[in-house]
Amino acid sequence: VGTAVGFSAILMAEYDPVPCQITTIENYEKRIPIARENFKRAGKEAQIALLEGDAAEVLKTLEGSYDFIFMDAAKGQYIHFLPEILRLLAKDGVLVSDNVLQDGDVIESRFAVTRRNRTIHKRMREYLYTLTHSEELVTAVLPVGDGITLSTRR
């Protein structure tokens, strides 16, 4: 969820030991043609499907189950994407969420966070709480870089 210019999708397609099909979602119109061109240059356009639109809406249209979901989209929306992510995540599937510690801001008081970032801060804290207290998931929060979570579906 969140393609940007396609770097992560290409990396996963290139190094997955088992040939897989990757579905990725992007909403920012300027990045979409760049990602498509990058997929083509990497020779991965047949392996990577890029769905255009708001992830909250696109996720609702997806069917089946996914063994692995990588979330690197609008940080304030992670909590809103989660119900659909859980619907799609296979049993024993893995959810990786990137940038969850927001440069360390997530552990700060909301008053220490700049006013314009308070909503993202609040939602990310709610997201982390939900992941770590969910009966459906086992989650580890890794303080690497900007923070990452690894969640496995029970």
PLM segments and residue spans:
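S-adenosylmethionine/decaboxylated-SAM
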Residues: 1-154
